[in-house]
Amino acid sequence: MTIQTDGKTDVLWFLPTHGDGRYLGASEGARDVSLPYLRQIAQAADDLGYYGVLLPTGRSCEDSWVVASALAPLTQRLRFLVAVRPGLQEPSMAARMAATLDRISDGRLLINVVTGGDPVELKGDGVFLDHDERYVVTDEFLHIWRGLMAGETVNFEGKHLRSENGRVIFRPVQAPYPPLYFGGSSPAGIEVAAEHCEVYLTWGEPPAGVAEKIAKAREAAERKGKTFSYGIRLHVIVRETESEAWEAADRLISRLDDATIAQAQATLKRQDSVGQSRMMALHGGDRNKLVVSPNLWAGVGLVRGGAGTALVGSADQVADRMKEYIDLGIDRFILSGYPHLEEAYRFAELVFPKLPLRATTGTAPSTARNNGPFGEVIANDIVPTRRVSAH
């Protein structure tokens, strides 16, 4: 399954299930990420024409599958990028969850493959494997998961995972399965992405760093006879003028003190994620070294793991920087801004008219049926056969 690029781009927004507010690292201006608030963001993104929304995963977040299942019936066209977690989930259970959510959303599910990069959190979740061994699990997981979602009866025996006569009876709407997104900067991660996935993701490094990662990912994919689509994860601070945007960036970290930054950086350093290390190297924890490329600001990464950079500037400047990434091969952006409700509107109103956007279209109605109807499954395993009437 290969997604072809056409010189245009999709823009996804972000559901802040781990918290939202006006300032980083402070309770002042914070918001309760209740279901009604998340519904407002999702419905705004749907109405504004965002392609989809990313739901984060991990112990700092509400469960992404439950949230997406709650919001899918409340939206019409919006796609939901939700994580499978090799090592935390069994592939058969993850496949059933994905197939069901794809069906009840009428084909609006996207899959984010997350191996995990924090050994402390992973041990709390029962995963005690080192960095490269976790990617072995991810590879085995995806072999099984993809086969199940494609309708195969899966028999697999790997180093960590086994499946004997595994099946998914209720198939997803999207064939053979929803697109797989994958972000991994290490050689092990890139190889797994090239083997299994359609979209290779990177966090928002300067263009030279993104070009380097794309080149490595493209080479790995070509060795396997595949072609990637490429996405980038960034924050955005856009205003009508550049000076207003930089003032907003300064306000966002205005409640941060040095002790909070030091504590956050020490916690992030325990991760063995190559991508996280690359993010932290951009600023070194120094709030005086945050402009890492034209209109690219690393202030978010002082206290936030994962995506730590933001495009900052006027609408024209932000659009121009995005077009520079598009020229490198990026064809989908996953964006966010604080607070997420207001900034979803602001970005769409100011920047959408300046971007080569693909049209956001819904899927055909009434596609989510049980590949039937055929009645109830017999003995939890056998699909009743359709009898042909004699005439």
Swiss-Prot record:
SUPFAM superfamilies: Bacterial luciferase-like. The keyword Ribonucleoprotein does not apply. One of its GO terms (biological process) is alkanesulfonate catabolic process. InterPro entries: Alkanesulphonate_mOase_FMN-dep, Luciferase-like_dom, Luciferase-like_sf, SsuD_RutA_monooxygenase. The keyword Glycoprotein does not apply. It is an enzyme of class 1 (oxidoreductase). CDD domains: Alkanesulfonate_monoxygenase. It catalyses: an alkanesulfonate + FMNH2 + O2 = an aldehyde + FMN + sulfite + H2O + 2 H(+). Catalyzes the desulfonation of aliphatic sulfonates. PANTHER family: ALKANESULFONATE MONOOXYGENASE (PTHR42847), ALKANESULFONATE MONOOXYGENASE-RELATED (PTHR42847:SF4). HAMAP family: Alkanesulf_monooxygen. This is Alkanesulfonate monooxygenase. The gene is ssuD.
